[in-house]
């Protein structure tokens, strides 16, 4: 199974983009107009070319084309299932059911044609398209026409989710995902005129619950003709109301003579009342041979009536498109294509299985950790053929071998562990996958000391902080050793800057990518009023703070990673403290290092508590650095100080309206606390007395902070002065 095969053209920003939205409680929407406008704004030099292509397609003489030739247009297809081992990883049976529906719809074999309004029955067309799953992939290898890819991009479907496209002149690409970033969408496609300039994004991207009629699509409340509708767009069909406005706006035309003008429909009105429409009697309702009736049952409507027909005029338009060189459509059905993709009559895929597995939990403790859940559950996700037997091997595991679908394993030695699966159809057809450093087993007795900084200067610290790059991409935690950090030379780093060249950086972007790093165990007994604190330096490539949408989530576990409880989520100005830059951010002499101090929860004050730092990628991520991680009574930076110095920390930080200044001085003395806003206006000042080498907290009055924002807190004695940033959320 592939993880992050990076191919994509940035030109796929959606010219000719068409979106089909869900019918349940949500108005149907199409993204054609908005995305076309956005594309033209970014690429105005292409506007005339696109218009010329559209006009050329519309003016083709269909009578000169072999629309009535013997046999169908056989089109090879591939389904790219983008998933994270959830329900979106739909079965081969569900995909084959979707292909069945496509072929019935495009060949007028669907059983519900008898429900079509009598007026329109003479117009219903057999388009003559036949879709077949490829049996040979672009490298000449055996395939069942299903390409499975594990990626975080499954959850936020857009052009950057169209991973590993196969050559569009040989295969029609369909991407299946868990959901779209924009709520309510079922699918979208590119029309040929737009796809001409976006070969890597040409095809359909669709929500898994709108694929076929079984599996996750069974009783889903969505139409099983979603793919039929979207492929219509790919073959140059517009919605019946046109491509320049949403439905229910005004009467429009799709440039097909035998589909009546309509304003479009978002739900199924009574078919018997199709003449009772807004378009009745208006000047808009003049085109179309069928007068004032509206064709609610057309595949290119949103009515879900059910939709069950293309017209002869729509067929002509699609035949024009598939015989055109625009977007290489005319190459999809050639004898060469059929041979190279393995869709000739009688060709059936019988491939070696592709072994794949997953463990939802990848971090646990030693098997002798008393009273703790230490089990790792593996699950077989092999594909490409029927799996009749499995052979698992677990290094240092108990059991060490297994033949079940979901083996449960624990480990009695610590460190990274490998796992191997051999998935077999028979003795000669099998696939094997080994994943090294797949799970990490921690020894809860190997504890980090409380009230001491982990500075990462000792290389031994690195091995005890396991890093999980779940999707094996460039965006990951790593260890940094190039200096300019509070502890001296080394720190933790999250590599968030996307340094990949075009076109690789136009797909599989870091937005919503999840990466974890776990701490060793801490004995936090007696620290119910303590803190988790660390030094933070970070930047963003965003132009303004409202665009910052990455986050750092700090959680704890008292059961060896079986469950995690969130302590704090940092985002926006609470996370980014070194402004914006379009180049990679690294610490320098003038870098701002903020102290993040997070109050412990009472439930975390446990003799065996772990902490997890989870980075969730944003659209404008840059690099992030962490140093001096500590779990203790006092936050980082208020440990024992030298003569003349002042140790200061703000807790919590960020805060709502209640924050305290924790101060440590080397002698009994008076110190001044001054709070200013960002323009330097003093909004609070006081003098407090400290006790030598003892951390003391001084509460700031809540009425000091009347508005959310950033404030500067300065603590000074006769010798030294320290200023820190306080964020009020």
Feature names for model-found ranges:
Residues 20, 24, 389, 641-651, ...:
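C-terminal outer-membrane/trafficking sorting elements
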Residues 25-106:
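Primarily auto-inhibitory N-terminal propeptides
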Residues 71, 77-87, 92-135, 148-356:
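Extracellular (secreted or membrane-anchored) zinc-dependent metallopeptidases
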Residues 340-360, 442-455, 510-512, 631-651, ...:
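Residue-level detector of functionally pivotal "anchor" positions at catalytic/ligand-binding pockets or at interdomain
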Residues 343-452:
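Extracellular/lumenal mature domains of secreted and surface-exposed proteins
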Residues 449-507, 511-513, 572-580, 593-594, ...:
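Extracellular glycan-recognition surfaces and repeat-rich motifs
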Residues 507-527, 531-533, 594-597:
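Short beta-strands within extracellular/lumenal beta-sheet-rich domains
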Residues 510-515, 544-547, 616-634:
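Extracellular carbohydrate recognition
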